[in-house]
């Protein structure tokens, strides 16, 4: 983590006014397609900016060639791009004024020294513009309290979200998806669920501190594999 996270910076992640989906599509075999579909499926009520230069329409919305072409800077961007494209895309989003981002892409510090070096460059690029990041190598987040789903897990393909005053922060994306799925089957919901991935910028403790102050969260659960 570069600097401690403030409540406003995490609010841009968990309750953004607008979201740009980089690589949005209607193809459900692709991460960008699943992220985009589930965001719309759960009736997120902020502005949605699908980013895809090759399409005229995606699920009824106008896509934009790049984040630089959106009507306003998005609070949040989410991407699942090939690793070698992430740094340039983060640079473009940060320069546009995006406040926060989720990087689903893996093979950064989780794949050795070369990936670690690139991960540090990505974080530095974002930090130079005050942009905060979840990931890389994460499943994203689920925020029923805000009707926000930016998660690549098939567990979120449900008819409706169940909101309850339980926050869950996980260092394992797979476990977050499994817990969400099993809880949903028992009628149990959440306020926010976050997969923190490599914690290159924001860490588990940042979100725990946010949830302590969150009015819609009364119980905090976490899955911890290690503490830095």
Question: Model-found features: residue ranges?
Answer:
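Catalytic-core regions of core metabolic enzymes
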Residues: 1-228
